[in-house]
Amino acid sequence: MKLELIGHDEKYALEQSLLTLFPGEKPVYGTVDKTADTRWARVTLTEEDERVQVTTELGMDGKSAAHSYDYPLSGTEYEKEGQRRHAVGISFFGAAKDLLGISPAWGSLTGVRPAKVALSLIREGGKKRAEKELQELYCVTPARARLAIEAADAGIRAAAELGCEAVWIMDD
């Protein structure tokens, strides 16, 4: 698949999604020609006022879809880099989901431990909100969202019993 990156160089997030959603496709980086290329994605990242916006245009065999995702940037430059990567992944996943008409059970959570994402979401807003965000933002099925919450909760309980700050499988 021809991949054109505009305003960024977030290849890893795209390659993870490509492997999951388009098995057998190999990334080829360059300028997309919508008339000549049969399988392509153009992923554009812009930043303004401490927000990142990523728009993915995706085409395959004459069909196409587009998805935009806007996300606030905050914290250190390292944290912002992760937020940019997150936005690229969600944008690409949204376009692929629309194009293919399917969504994997773990949604857009590729290349990450779902319980780690669930733990972060629990810390930000509790279990109910975390389960809702896993389903709505990451497109995780309800059963898998509950499983991720249960795994994160088990890690929290284990850490409390052991007197640890965090359990290694969920810590950064």
Give a label for each model feature.
Residues 5-10:
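Short, surface-exposed ligand-recognition loops at beta-strand->loop->(often short) alpha-helix junctions
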Residues 108, 112-119, 153-172:
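N-terminal pre-triad scaffold of radical SAM enzymes
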Residues 2-4, 167:
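A structural signal for isolated positions on well-ordered beta-strands in alpha/beta enzyme cores
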